Design a protein with these regions (language model features):
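A short, well-structured alpha-helix characteristic of acyl/acetyltransferase catalytic modules
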Residues: 1-40, 147, 158-160
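Acetyl-CoA-dependent GNAT
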Residues: 27-74, 80-85
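Short hydrophobic/aromatic beta-strand or adjacent loop that forms the aromatic wall/cage
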Residues: 47, 147-151
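Conserved catalytic-core motifs of GNAT/GCN5-like acyltransferases
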Residues: 127-147
Length: 160
């Protein structure tokens, strides 16, 4: 279930800090930096931040995205699972993305190649006749291996 992230602000920060200097953090940030989201006490109309919780209200993930209302575009998605393999995280992510595909003209998101969620993103993108762009060898990871940047876009022609 999605809850406003402000309700779990401190817990989200602590969970994110556990992943500093890891590949999981690289997949979240898209580079070698570490990151803790700045969760707004009073969110504006452009940024949406959610805690993903299970039926016991236990924090299992974090989801954020931005909206460009003028362009009718949802973008800048960020997802972090604190409970690897928990299907609720994927269910909530793709449920929200599905909602946004039908509400806006365009949604776009990026990821680092090799991210375990890539096949799920590919299926979701294909379901809505989206496009996957690959920027080959876009940066080097901590092991000096090249990684691709992948950009997904889905255009809903009915929402212009």
């Amino acid at each position: 279930m999605l809850k406003p992230a402000i309700m779990y602000k401190d817990e989200i920060k602590k969970q994110m800090q556990k992943y500093f200097y890891t590949d999981d953090m690289m997949y979240e940030v898209g580079e070698l930096d570490n990151y803790v989201p700045e969760i707004a006490d009073e969110p504006d109309r452009y940024c949406f931040q959610y805690a993903i919780v299970d039926s016991n209200e236990k924090l299992i993930g974090y989801l954020a995205y931005a909206i460009d209302w003028h362009a009718s575009c949802a973008y800048n998605f960020g997802l972090f699972s604190f409970d690897r393999g928990n299907p609720i995280v994927g269910k909530e992510l793709f449920g929200k993305m599905e909602e946004l595909v039908h509400k806006f003209h365009r949604i776009e998101w990026r990821m680092v190649g090799g991210n375990p969620v890539e096949k799920s993103y590919d299926r979701f993108c294909a379901k809505y006749n989206g496009t996957k762009h690959i920027l080959k060898d876009a940066f080097k990871d901590r092991n000096c291996e090249y990684r691709d940047y992948i950009i997904y876009e889905i255009i809903n022609e009915e929402n212009k």
